[in-house]
Regions:
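Bacterial N-terminal signal peptides
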Residues: 21-32
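N-terminal secretory signal peptides that target proteins for export/translocation
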Residues: 1-18
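Outer membrane pore-forming secretion/assembly proteins and partners of Gram-negative envelopes
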Residues: 40-169
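Amphipathic, positively biased hydrophobic alpha-helical segments used for protein targeting
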Residues: 32-33, 158
């Protein structure tokens, strides 16, 4: 069997170019780019520290020494309602972009989601907090400067509070 030959002497698939080869090449390129973009999105991470704190009003002020990074904030309103603060739990956790991470608490539970990194020095996070009965008591998206602390508050009976403080690097 002989191949048909074009005027230039090429086989027909070479004579007019190969449209299906271009389609295959484009598919390969698009797939590679999509994979690269997926990897780039997955690489957006940050390391966060979570402090679970109990707060109450008492006769003598007392702040757990482990809370020294947030001590100044705890002495200002609205936290100055209480004067006794005790660390309940401490957790370091990496967060990946758009992935909700569970934050185990002594009282209830929480989740943290890294929304995005802003200006290379700030992180935008969504935090949800549930009480011990599973009722959501906080759901907030906020931007925090690296090294600064956010504090979420859940008021409890008897003028007590349940606080979740966090910072990210």
């Amino acid at each position: 069997m002989s191949e048909r030959v074009s005027e230039r002497g090429d086989a027909p698939w070479r004579a007019k170019g190969c449209p299906w080869a271009a389609v295959v090449m484009m598919t390969v390129i698009v797939s590679a780019l999509a994979g690269t973009l997926k990897e780039a999105r997955a690489d957006v991470t940050t390391e966060c520290e979570f402090l679970e704190i109990s707060a109450k009003a008492g006769d003598k002020p007392a702040i757990d020494p482990a809370l020294s990074p947030v001590e100044k904030k705890l002495k200002k309103p609205p936290f100055s309602t209480w004067n006794q603060f005790k660390l309940l739990s401490h957790l370091q956790k990496p967060l990946a972009k758009k992935k909700a991470e569970p934050i185990p608490l002594k009282i209830g539970s929480a989740t943290a989601t890294l929304v995005e990194i802003v200006d290379k020095s700030k992180v935008r996070l969504t935090i949800t907090m549930d009480d011990h009965k599973g009722k959501q008591v906080a759901n907030n998206t906020a931007t925090v400067e690296a090294g600064d602390y956010l504090i979420y508050v859940h008021g409890l009976p008897n003028n007590e509070g349940h606080l979740l403080s966090l910072t990210c690097k």
